[in-house]
Amino acid sequence: QVTIGEESYPLPKPFLVMATQNPVEQEGTYPLPEAQMDRFLLKVNLGYPTKSDELNIMRKQMSGTLEELSAVVSLEQIVRARGFIERIYMDEKIENYILDIVFATREPQNYQLGPLRNKISFGASPRGSIALAKAAKCHAFLRHRGFVTPDDVRAVAPAVLRHRIGLTYEAEAEELSTENIVTEILNTLMVP
């Protein structure tokens, strides 16, 4: 639901939001607060299109005729898929692996990652653990498996955590990225 003032409005189910983010360096853009960023399940970096893709984009835009879009999946199919994903099995060892990854963003010194302590200004919140578990289940679902593996967790960790970790000035001066931090955590922690 959405609440405006004292009035609440129910939202349809499923309710999905996809958003784009412009670089902060562009005029008129401002960074979202961490609490708002934390509400997004994933942050996927797309980069620029290839030259041929951009040529197609340019031609379609200039011709004034955009392709008719049709739904590739129905709302009912999304709801049904969500039900399947919720039932995907996650072993307690995988749950603890997820918690170790997230806790390593908060307390790196407790995970043989002491040097990261001066690089991370804040780590992932409990929403990060929940998001990592959900995304790992989705990854398993897309691979037609009824259970989560450590590889599922590792595959989605950068997209789930990159916007949930704050870098210190020291890390920024060294041109470290949150991807570097996540990679170091994944490469250091014991995989179950």
Q: What is the meaning of each model-derived region?
A:
Residues 107-192:
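C-terminal engagement/docking regions of AAA+ P-loop ATPases
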